[in-house]
Design a protein with these regions (language model features):
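Active-site microenvironments that recognize anionic phosphate/pyrophosphate groups
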Residues: 1-166, 172-244, 249-252, 265-266, ...
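A generic alpha-helix signature
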Residues: 131, 256-259
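Internal helical hairpin/lid segments
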Residues: 259-276
Length: 350
């Protein structure tokens, strides 16, 4: 037991994530250590607006032999290499509890954000981002009529395993609740039953009052580095009011969401003057049977970027993180400050 007074900026500590029920080890004293690890080459930042060899550009032929239309806004098509199958059969039950198998069904789609091969989300005009939001909502609602979970997400950049440079996202519809969603369903419901209020609605109010982890605030939206963030510059984007699914957003809230996404992703790119890689996606109330209470759910987006110190140095979740629990050096408050310190106007637009 130490006689020194605890200081979260200097002393190692753990932070609890009430959404997942897991802890994150924070080691702020390590942030000053010298770095001699991997230094990756940054991705090519200048791309043409059209690439005749790109499978996602308008009028080009894909691997399947299908030809893309001359689309002007977003374009959605069935993933040519889907991870799920609509007609997959049920798996036989096993009498051995150590070898369980569950048959699953679903489908995967690709969403091209725009016809421009060179423009990522932060580089698109707000009205184009608004079109992406509308497409997300349409796809989620359509597939939610048949599947209990619909995951909308984007992997941006080669670092995140993106195999096509043309800016795009994906939609995976599942006949089952994935692990992350099942954990959130359990913890959100438990909080709601114990406190009589929505965890993330309460969290927004707490973050607005604190202020130290806020990155972007608009009329209807708040982006923060979560108190329990595991990735260096991880953020969560939430509405300021109780919204269970994207379909419940008003036109004003959707317009404002486009502005919030533009500001947040521009700050990411501006941090290291590069096309900032990340995995992002939306969480919202699953599509349970009609009549099921979903008031404990709150719409939110999660951004998980791997960059740590520069455009070429990234965080690796290895060793202790894989075998024990997530660990970070930079505190959430320090990360938020660094993101606040850069402009929300994209460096290419200045």
């Amino acid at each position: 037991m130490s006689n020194v007074e605890f200081n979260p900026v200097d002393h190692p500590h753990r932070r609890f994530n009430p959404l997942t029920g897991q802890w994150v080890l924070v080691s702020p004293h390590r942030a000053k250590r010298p770095w001699s690890g991997a230094d990756e080459k940054p991705a090519i930042d200048e791309l043409p607006s059209y690439d005749e060899k790109c499978f996602l550009c308008p009028t080009n032929e894909r691997v399947s032999g299908d030809v893309n239309p001359d689309y002007q806004g977003t374009y959605v098509f069935k993933n040519d290499f889907a991870a799920l199958m609509v007609d997959s059969p049920d798996a036989p039950e096993s009498d051995n509890p150590l070898f369980k198998t569950q048959g699953v069904r679903g489908l995967s789609r690709v969403i091209c954000f725009s016809p421009d091969h060179s423009k990522t989300l932060p580089e698109l005009p707000v009205e184009k981002i608004r079109g992406v939001i509308e497409t997300w909502n349409e796809q989620i609602e359509e597939l939610g009529k048949e599947y209990v979970w619909v995951q909308a997400f984007e992997n941006k950049g080669e670092t995140m395993g993106c195999s096509q440079p043309h800016p795009h996202g994906q939609i995976w519809a599942n006949s089952f609740l994935p692990n992350e969603i099942e954990r959130k369903e359990h913890n959100l419901k438990a909080y709601y039953q114990e406190h009589g209020s929505n965890l993330l609605v309460d969290y927004v109010q707490a973050e607005l009052k604190d202020g130290s982890r806020i990155v972007v605030e608009t009329e209807h939206w708040l982006a923060v580095v979560p108190y329990w963030a595991a990735w260096p510059f991880e953020t969560m984007l939430l509405p300021k009011t109780h919204i269970r699914r994207m379909s419940e957003l008003s036109d004003e809230q959707r317009d404002d969401l486009a502005r919030a996404i533009k500001k947040l992703t521009s700050r990411y790119d501006n941090l290291f003057q590069c096309s900032f890689p990340y995995s992002m996606g939306w969480h919202y109330a699953p599509f349970f049977e009609q009549g099921t209470d979903i008031d404990h759910w709150q719409l939110h987006a999660l951004f998980y970027p791997p960059l740590l110190r520069s455009a070429t140095i990234r965080k690796f979740m290895v060793g202790y993180e894989m075998l024990a629990e997530s660990q970070r050096d930079l505190t959430a408050e320090q990360a938020a400050q660094r993101l606040r310190d850069v402009s929300d106007v994209h460096y290419k637009e200045c």
